[in-house]
């Protein structure tokens, strides 16, 4: 085959890295898997996150082998998965947003700022993470047929499809230089967008810290 369709994914990754200000960008199928892959790479242990965030964030930490702790505080746009240099950036997408030496995870859900429909992205300056994430997102291989590569690491089915990447490239063509964060208020009911996750049985044993 003359052209690998996953070249479109690479083009989208390059576009997002240039826009956000990171050296590298690794596309995934959603922000949750981006967080899980990054957490796996960091070998997280105890991770502190806000008590009000999206349900899958603490689950991604647990799947990566970490323990979740909650803290009561308000956040806007992004927050850190403390004490690691890992940021949930699902509600922010603006030029130059990348924090040097960090790992920032984006969302392209239909309700997010770049509404591809589904998709996520890891922003990083760490070349070793690029190798790990690009292989692990695609079942341990590069974007080739399985008989054309050696599978040396454990991976997941967490890659972005060329179709999603093509839509992302199209939307970025007219995306503004600066965009405001998505607010954490439910516009329909004028109440907090996220419930307190400590009320769910899954997280009832998670410690709350100050």
Give the ranges of each region predicted by the language model.
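Conserved N-terminal alpha-helix of the aminotransferase class I/II PLP-enzyme fold
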Residues: 1-30, 182-209
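Alpha-helix N-cap/helix-start capping motif
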Residues: 6, 29-32, 51, 127
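Phosphate-binding glycine-rich loop
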Residues: 9-47, 57-64
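Short, acidic/glycine-rich phosphate-metal binding loop used to engage nucleotide
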Residues: 22, 31, 74-75, 110
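Short, well-ordered alpha-helix to beta-strand connector turns
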Residues: 22-23, 82, 100-102
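PLP-dependent aminotransferase-like
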Residues: 39-98
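Active-site region of PLP-dependent enzymes
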Residues: 93, 103-210
